[in-house]
Amino acid sequence: MSIGEVSDSAGHLASLVLPIEVAPIAPLIPEPPATAEHIFTLRHVYHHGTHKHPSLHRKHDVTPSNADVWLAAEDGYEAERIGPLRARSNALRIQRLVDRRPSVVDPMVAQSRQQGFVSVLSPSAWTVDDVAGPDVTDKGTVLTMALMAANAYVEGPGKADWQDVGAPFNRSLDFGWEGDGLRGHVFADENNSTIVIGLKGTSPAVFDGDGTTTNDKVNDNLFFSCCCAQQGPWTWHQVCDCATGTYTCNNTCVTQALREENRYYQAARELYANVTEVYPDSHVWIAGHSLGGAVSSFLGLTYGVPVVTFQAVPDALPAGRLGLPVPPGADPNAPQSRDYTGAFHFGHTADPIYMGSCNGATASCSFAGYALESACHTGHECVYDTVGDKGWRVGIGTHKIVAVIRDVILKYDTVPECKFTPECRDCGNWKMYESNGTETTTTSSAPTTTSISRTRTETCKTPHLKSQQQRQRPRPRPLHALPQWEGGNPDSPERNEEM
C-alpha cells in the first residue's frame, strides 16, 4: 500500500470517529448551613426617636459587668435575671434581594413611597438562599427568642452612657427623649457570627401607663386599621382622613400617611442600618413582641433576614402599604401569599390581638382607642391552641410577653407547627382604590366594624382561669432554676411595664 493510500484510509477512519461530548459544568450550589449551637450575650442598646425627636439616634455599649438580661416583673412575677441565652440555628430558605445593603435597599423603598407603587425589579435582582436561621422547631430556641423580645422592654441598666449615632443630638431637647421612639437590644454569639435584634413594642396607657404609649397608638392605628380607624366604634382614635364613602377608602391617602419619615418603620430601618454597620459579616436575626413584632417583620421583608415574633399584630395589611420590595410574580398588596420570607409568628388562640379579633364594638382594644382590624400574618403562623388545650377564654390579658413565656412557651412540651396561610384576606368589606393624591377626603361614621374573610372570634373577655387577684397560685419557679438557665435574682433594675 502506498503512502497516499495509507493517508486516504486514515482520513476515512477519522471521519467515522464520533465527536466526544463534553458534559456541561453544573453551577456550584452552596451546601446549606449545618445545625449549630449559639450562646448570646447583650452587647448594645440602640434608641431611635420617632415623633418628638425623629432625628435622635443613640447607642449604649453594654460592658460585661452590666450585660445581664432581665425579664421584667409582671402580674405577680418578680423581675429576675436570666442566665445564658442558648439557641440553635438550622438551614432556612429565604427569597430575598441579591444586594441587601441598606444603602441600596432604602432608596428603593423611598422611591416606592414617593411614586405610590412598588418598583418592578429584574428577576436577576433576587435570589433564594439557604441561610443559618433560628430553629423554630426547637423549644429552647423559641424560648430564647421570646426572652430577647421581653428584654427589649427593660429600661436600664441604671443611668446608661448614651452616645449619639450620626449627627449630635440637641442637648437642650434631652428631657423626655427616652420615652419617645424605638428601642432595640442587640445580642451577639461568642464569635459574632450571628446577632439578634430585639425590638420594643407597644405599651398602651389604658393598661400600663405612659411611656411610648401615645405614639404607639398612632402607629398601631395607621398600621393595622383598614382606613385610618374610620367608620368604626366612636372610641377608635382616628389618625388620618382617607375614607371617601361608606366602606370606601383612598388607599393612596393611607399609604402616604403611613410612610411619613417619623414613623416606626423608617426609624427601624435606620436602627438596622447602624447595627449592621457594626456587624457587617454577621447573620442577623430579629425578634419582637406586639408592635415590635410587626416592625420586626417589616425589616425581615425589607432586608431578607429571619424574624421570630410573639403575639404580633397581624402585619400583612401594613406590609402591603409600605412600598417593600417584592420578588417577580408576588402580589405587593397581599404579602401573606408570599412564601420563603423567613418570618415566623408565634402566638396563642386566647390573644385577640394576635388572632385579629380585638376590633368589635365591645372589645377591650376598641375601648382603648385601638383599631386593630388586620387579621393576616406574613410568612408562617405558629399557633398554640390555649383555648382548646387549656380552656382559656379570649382576653387582652393573655397578650403580655412575660405571661406568654411563663404560661404558654414553658408550659407546652413542644412548639406548635408553623403553617403558611396564603388564603387569608384583610378588609373584605372595604373597597380600596388608588388615586393621584389630590382628592379631598371626608369622614363618615358607622357603628359596625370591618369583617374579614378569615373567621375569628370577636369576644374579648377575661381568661377562663381566675384573674391574678382572685386565684391563689404557688410562687412561680424562677427561670434560673430551670435546667436551661443559670444565674441569680438580685434586686431588679428600673423597668418599663409593657402590654
UniProtKB/Swiss-Prot annotation:
Cytoplasmic side: 1-9
Topological relation to the membrane, as annotated: Single-pass type II membrane protein
Disordered: annotated span: 436-499
Keywords of the record: Autophagy, Endosome, Glycoprotein, Hydrolase, Lipid degradation, Lipid metabolism, Membrane, Signal-anchor, Transmembrane, Transmembrane helix
Single GO MF annotation: phospholipase activity
Top-level taxonomic group: Eukaryota
CDD domains: Lipase_3
Lumenal-side positions: 31-499
Compositionally skewed regions (Low complexity) per UniProt: 438-454
Function: Lipase which is essential for lysis of subvacuolar cytoplasm to vacuole targeted bodies and intravacuolar autophagic bodies. Involved in the lysis of intravacuolar multivesicular body (MVB) vesicles. The intravacuolar membrane disintegration by atg15 is critical to life span extension.
Protein name: Putative lipase atg15
Gene name for this UniProt entry: atg15
